[in-house]
Amino acid sequence: EEVFISQLYRVAEGFDSSLATLNERTKSLTLTKEQRLEFERELSIAEAVAILYRSVANQADFIRHRDQLGTVADRSGAKSRLKELLLSEIKLARRLYELQSADSRIGFEATNHYFYVPDDLMEKVLNCRYLLENWVEKI
């Protein structure tokens, strides 16, 4: 479980780091407006992938901490981590919403049509906020 979660975080961090490097190294490239727009569209796909990996890692980490609530000595530490994960998920869902709203390729898969739509991402934010305000505070 720990290895699985840590590997997902490593993949997400690898995407984030690679995107930062790519952005830094391509700032000074001379591109036409059309080329720059196309390049930025491709960057948004990579950012969406990074978000998805981080979200999967967050969700696995959330489940681990939730399931340990009854057995851990440091209940406040677990509660604090659950809050961090929910806040992270809200931030990720909002960013993914922005990316998907700008690029219909994000969240789309031809045979299933959509894995998720913008409304799903808004609902995720609401669900995370509900858990923060109504569940985490009561555990």
Locations of regions flagged by a protein language model:
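Catalytic domains of carbohydrate-active enzymes that cleave complex glycans
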Residues: 1-139
